From Swiss-Prot:
Region spans: NADH dehydrogenase I subunit D: 414-794
Region (NADH dehydrogenase I subunit B): 1-154
Sequence similarity: In the N-terminal section; belongs to the complex I 20 kDa subunit family. In the central section; belongs to the complex I 30 kDa subunit family.
Subcellular location: Cell inner membrane
Name the record gives this protein: NADH-quinone oxidoreductase subunit B/C/D
Function, as annotated: NDH-1 shuttles electrons from NADH, via FMN and iron-sulfur (Fe-S) centers, to quinones in the respiratory chain. The immediate electron acceptor for the enzyme in this species is believed to be ubiquinone. Couples the redox reaction to proton translocation (for every two electrons transferred, four hydrogen ions are translocated across the cytoplasmic membrane), and thus conserves the redox energy in a proton gradient.
One GO CC term on file: plasma membrane
SUPFAM superfamilies documented for this protein: HydA/Nqo6-like, HydB/Nqo4-like, Nqo5-like
HAMAP family: NDH1_NuoB (MF_01356), NDH1_NuoC (MF_01357), NDH1_NuoD (MF_01358)
Length: 794
């Protein structure tokens, strides 16, 4: 070797050569669980260009993948499927835990969530953040590359010799043994919890419940309410009682009377209540002033003609927790009643298929009962053995109780719970005659994060970050929906400047959400280009949002009474630069898709629903407006200052996938109009309310007077005490109507918080939209509905 080595010759070891090839051509499995996966997808777009690392092509089957990125929350119901995918992956293989939830459960120490995926899978690299930015994911990938290059010796295993190592070699962690069960999460070893050794860290030590507070302010009802109440007295007499509702007219009836009362309200009155808005229950057993009954069934109805809501309540006792089903009156009631059965144990006589919907079939107890544990760390440790008890049932199980189809040879096709076409962890089971869909069922709950249960242990302000993660593509729109209900409950007036800031951010997030939908929907039907344009524009929106709030997907920026800070220097120039260019980008989307023969063939006449069917099924938002009904809460029931803006309600005819596309494309233009108006007309003045009983005081006020300082201390520690009462309010979110039903017992947090999301009724309609279509059409229909799994399962 005395001669010099030519420049085109490289000397290395076999270990280094194998490691070099592996680390520069990672094959990630397509495995998205939650919010983090959206940021992971962002790393594959032009701004970040993951292709530089040779890892930009996600594999649709585990047999072609060697890297599993647990991007998002690891759910207990998903554990068995997660293990199955991992076991089918090629060797050697590696695991990255992306985000706080995957690392440790994050902010979701709740009954349905594993406190870290490392309880069932070995993890090579942990990426912090909630969610991590695309840059953080790329840093995690480089960390894994470095681990492969420095710590693995694959030559001997490759040559079938003893010794060496490759792939993941770390052990899984045992909850409570090799892994902490501290309710505050990892990293607190040997750090004492607050209070004494005899005191639970969640002790209720404040005096808010015993202090005087103002009553809930009463909203003036419409003039049509009095004639309606008179009609009810004539028809039902004393069988239906009026309750003193402060937010909407409220009726109380015995359970047996409920179906007839609801039928009367839907069919027999002028200006009927056509849509079942929501159906839920309240466990009354922990009330400070406990009523005689144990449970209350609550029905919320919507009248399009009255532009208003009505509430019906039915008291129940634990020993007779049964009410007649109303699925014959509203098909949308099917899933709502199953959820009430699952979460509360309420039975519905006459329901066609009463079974659990969110929790696994073998789950013990009903999670929204006050007696059910809230925290995962208060329950037995979750292990691989536990996961084996939650294996999803066979596909044939879902059709075993249905009438057989004569003279057809049928097959079962399982789609999900992990499939690129389902846009998240959702299982769709198809019953097929050849390629034609005879019947269809959905298994949901794989993304259930216990959001409503968590609200019962957080104070009103602490819960705001959790709302960001309901529809994790809608950002501040979630905050607005929650705060609209809480502010109405408390009677808080939001200053004009704060209203405009909220509208500005909400419409930017509406555009960002529609862009993700547009790009992925186009991709579903074979158009590859739009998704890159869509994510490019989305990143420009996030630049503005980050400038104003400091965050991207989940800024948690709204507060009771306004926003936490004023707009920063440079915000107007950033908004104007975006609005100047984005209109041309909308035109590009229009040219790319609207006239495309393949796009139209895949979408026109597919997944058709009439206006009447859409109302019966609980549709809202763009999916409802695609049937020709011009119903938009921003116009029909204005809130948050939207009555000060000039924009059109976009509708389309046909009620098919193409009509739903046209509505959302048009809404991009209308939201752009609103953003421009908000920027140009931004008023001066306060950005947070001066009603400091409920709102955070401005910093300078806290430095000037003791009252403001005391309120700030109380709001940060125990939280504001809301009046005893209840309030349901909804907003027009990007996917439809998102409403919060806040029930207060006079304390600093919700006694019961119900979240009415648009994704839940929309996905319930999938069988009606799909029967008689082909398998390929299901992917198109799913995409056209625009749902998010966290919005669906909460």
């Amino acid at each position: 070797m005395s001669e010099s080595i030519p420049k085109n010759i490289i000397l290395t070891t076999l270990d280094d050569a194998i490691n070099w090839g592996r680390k520069n051509s990672m094959w990630p499995m397509f495995f998205g669980l939650s919010c983090c996966f959206v940021e992971m997808m962002g790393s594959m777009t032009p701004r970040f260009d993951l292709a530089r690392f040779g890892a930009e092509v996600l594999r649709g089957t585990p047999r072609e993948a060697d890297l599993m990125v647990i991007a998002g929350t690891p759910f207990k119901k998903m554990a068995a499927s997660m293990l199955r995918v991992y076991e089918e992956m090629a060797n050697p293989k590696w695991v990255i835990a992306m985000g706080s939830c995957a690392n440790s459960g994050g902010m979701y120490d709740v009954y349905s969530v594993m406190q870290g995926v490392n309880q069932v899978l070995p993890v090579d690299v942990y990426i912090p953040g909630c969610p991590p930015r695309p840059e953080a994911f790329m840093q995690g990938l480089m960390t894994l590359q470095e681990k492969i290059a420095r710590k693995e010796s694959p030559a001997r295993p490759v040559l079938n010799l003893r010794g060496g190592n490759e792939g993941t070699t770390v052990p899984i962690l045992i909850d409570g043994s090799s892994k902490t069960r501290d309710t505050r999460g990892p990293g607190y070893g040997h750090c004492p919890i607050r209070g004494t050794a005899q005191q639970h860290p969640d002790f209720k030590g404040h005096r808010a419940a015993g202090m005087w507070g103002p009553p809930q302010p009463k909203i003036a009802f419409s003039a049509s309410t009095a004639p309606l109440l008179e009609q009810l007295r004539e028809r039902f007499g004393d069988d239906v009682r009026q309750e003193e509702g402060a937010d909407m007219p409220t009726l109380v009836a015995d359970p047996a009377q409920v179906p007839e009362l609801l039928r009367f309200l839907k069919q027999d009155i002028d200006q009927p209540y056509e849509r079942l808005e929501d159906l839920t229950a309240i466990d009354e057993t922990a009330r400070s002033q406990r009523p005689a009954h144990d449970l209350t069934m609550v029905y919320h109805l919507l009248s399009f003609e009255r532009a208003g809501y009505l509430r019906v309540k039915a008291p129940l006792r634990n020993d007779r927790a049964e009410v007649p089903s109303i699925t014959g009156l509203w098909p949308a009631a099917n899933w709502y009643e199953r959820e009430a059965f699952d979460m509360f144990g309420v039975r519905f006589a006459g329901h066609p298929d009463l079974r659990r919907i969110l929790m696994p079939e073998g789950w013990q107890g009903h999670p929204l009962r006050k007696s059910h544990p809230s925290r995962a760390t208060d329950m037995p440790p979750f292990t691989r053995d536990t996961a084996t008890t939650m294996v999803p049932p066979e596909g044939s199980h879902f059709f075993s109780n249905r009438a057989p189809v004569d003279n057809q040879s049928l097959s079962i096709l399982n789609l999900g719970p992990q499939h690129p076409g389902t846009h998240g962890i959702l299982r769709v089971i198809l019953q097929l005659a050849g390629e034609e869909i005879v019947d269809l069922d959905s298994e949901i709950g794989y993304h259930h994060r216990g959001a409503e249960k968590i609200a019962e242990r957080q104070h009103w302000n602490q819960y705001i970050p959790y709302t960001d993660r309901i529809d994790y593509l809608a950002g501040s729109l979630n905050n607005l929906a929650y705060l609209y209900s809480v502010e109405t409950l408390c009677g808080v007036e939001v200053p004009p400047r704060a209203r405009y800031i909220r509208v500005l951010l909400s419409e930017l997030f509406r555009i960002a959400s529609h862009l993700v939908w547009l790009g992925t929907f186009a991709h579903d039907v074979g158009a590859m280009t739009p998704v890159f344009y869509a994510f490019d524009s989305r990143e420009k929106i996030f630049d503005i949002i980050e400038l104003i709030t400091g965050g991207r997907m989940h800024p948690a920026w709204f507060r009771i009474g306004g926003v936490p800070d004023d707009l920063p220097d440079g915000w107007l120039a950033a908004v104007e630069a975006f609005t100047r260019d984005f209109e041309a980008r909308i035109d590009e989307f229009d040219r790319l898709l609207t006239g495309g023969p393949i796009f139209r063939a895949r979408t026109e006449g597919i997944g058709t629903v009439s206006r009447q069917q859409a109302v019966e099924l609980g549709f809202s938002g763009p999916n409802l407006r695609a049937t020709g009904l011009a119903w938009d809460l921003r116009k029909s029931m204005p809130y948050g200052g939207y009555d000060e803006f000039d924009f059109d309600v976009v509708t389309a005819g046909g009620g098919d996938c193409f009509a739903r596309y046209l509505v959302r494309l048009g809404e991009l233009r209308q939201s752009l109009r609103i953003v421009r108006q908000a920027a140009e007309g931004m008023p001066q003045g306060r950005w947070i309310s001066d009603q400091y009983r409920y709102a955070y005081p401005k910093r300078e006020d806290g430095l000037q007077d003791i009252e403001s300082l005391i309120h700030h201390f109380l709001h940060v520690s125990r939280g504001p005490a809301a009046p005893r009462g209840e309030c349901y309010r909804a907003i027009e979110s990007s996917k439809g109507e998102c409403g919060y039903y806040a029930v207060s017992d006079g304390g600093t947090g919700a006694y019961r918080l119900r979240i009415r999301t648009p994704s839940f009724p929309h996905l319930q309609a999938l069988p009606q939209l799909s029967r008689g279509r082909l398998v390929a059409d299901v992917i198109t229909i799913l995409g056209s509905l625009d749902y998010v799994l966290a919005d669906l399962d909460r």
